Amino acid sequence: MHSWPTPDIPALDGTPVPLALYDTADQQVKPVEVPPSGSGTPVGMYVCGITPYDSTHLGHAATYLAFDLIYRVLLDNDHQVHYVQNITDVDDPLFERAERDGVDWRELGTSQIDLFRKDMETLAVIPPKDYIGAIESIDEVIEMVSTLLEEGAAYVVDDPEYPDVYASINATENFGYESNYDAATMAELFAERGGDPDRPGKRNPMDALLWRAAREGEPSWESPFGPGRPGWHIECSAIATNRLGHSFDIQGGGSDLMFPHHEFSAAHAEAAHGVERMAKHYVHAGMISQDGVKMSKSLGNLEFVHRLTAAGHEPGAIRLGVYAHHYRGDRDWSDEILAAAEARLALWRSAITVATDVQAAVDAVAQLRTHLSNDLDTPAALAAVDAWAEAALKDTGNVSDTADQFDTPEFTPAGRILAAAVDALLGVRL
């Protein structure tokens, strides 16, 4: 499956700063273990993609914008990046939405994937090298499920009508290491987030579905263990390890995926391939709320990217609004946050046309690099650019924070240095 066009990313002078990120499993900020820069071996990064039954809302976008920063900082450090993202294009929510709307589930999925691509391109998100749907990875899933069955890490339930295949929660010794949740929390989240603890025939209520035996009215594919379709978690295990290797560098997504999805995805891969950790670094982005209430389809309070841009809001302002708070924290979105981001964008655009101190711009870029490399500290990074812009305007006596007269700005040499860094590292075009 194709992704979307790659944005132009300026190359920067100066010294980049190696990236450190909070690791969910180890519960600390630590240097990201990656191949040496210039070695020709890419950094392997896997991020869970969408289930394509609705448009891209700010919660989705915030996650992909966080990993876009990671990609950009790695590029600045002269690393190649092999970025893989999946699309869960066969799953219950997709079927349910298609039935509700009276459309074919394939058509719904195709239309929403197209919208997602457009939103990501609009937001200048660097695309994955491999953008892989669950349907196109069916053979890979079947191979991994077969391996787990052969290793005794999975079993078929004793149900002649629906012989589903499940993974044993005891297949790995350190299950739970990624989320660090206690047993009660895991059981609660498993039931809330797509698990089936009461399914008859399971050996343990927490065993996860690997292969759902064919049901009437659902798509299915032939396999050695009967016709059916993939479970949610095994899809990501297979897609990631078939492209990045049995153990790779960075795995991540939204914090709501930490358990059960990421915990089980890692466990399936580790049991199948005999590795201790599927990823060296587990990274999770916080959730977005709307005016203090968590964004939810059921509440109808989603803010969609395409609606914001259709209303005339610039992609750069949307990015700055998301980056106003740290990626790991749950954070709010409001009209006031967007307005503040637009004012910030105008301030920076004013400064790049009048800034004269080249060394000050170089120093600001160094601060920007330092803050982003410190667990993507975007609030500090944006504040550093703010301080540079305010100083530049103060030096010239121009305190205007409106951008009307800067529709086609002529960058000064100092402004050009800063604008290139903001573009390359933050994905914001000035």
From Swiss-Prot:
Record's subunit section: Monomer.
Drop me one GO molecular function for this one.
ATP binding
**Which cofactors, by name?**
Zn(2+)
Known InterPro entries for this protein? Answer: Cys-tRNA/MSH_ligase, Mycothiol_ligase_MshC, Rossmann-like_a/b/a_fold, tRNA-synt_1_cat_dom
* Residues where Zn(2+) binds: C48, C236, H261
- Coiled coil regions, renumbered to chain: none
Q: Which gene encodes it?
A: mshC
The organism named in the record is Corynebacterium efficiens (strain DSM 44549 / YS-314 / AJ 12310 / JCM 11189 / NBRC 100395)
Keyword check for ATP-binding, yes or no: yes
Q: Name one GO cellular component term.
A: cytosol
Task: Supply the name of the protein.
Answer: L-cysteine:1D-myo-inositol 2-amino-2-deoxy-alpha-D-glucopyranoside ligase
EC numbers for this chain? 6.3.1.13
What is the documented function of this protein?
Answer: Catalyzes the ATP-dependent condensation of GlcN-Ins and L-cysteine to form L-Cys-GlcN-Ins.
Q: Which protein family is it in?
A: Belongs to the class-I aminoacyl-tRNA synthetase family. MshC subfamily.
UniProt short sequence motif 'ERGGDP' region, positions renumbered to this chain: 192-197
Span of the annotated motif 'HIGH' region: 50-60
> Which reaction does this chain catalyze?
1D-myo-inositol 2-amino-2-deoxy-alpha-D-glucopyranoside + L-cysteine + ATP = 1D-myo-inositol 2-(L-cysteinylamino)-2-deoxy-alpha-D-glucopyranoside + AMP + diphosphate + H(+)
Q: Which UniProt keywords apply?
A: ATP-binding, Ligase, Metal-binding, Nucleotide-binding, Zinc
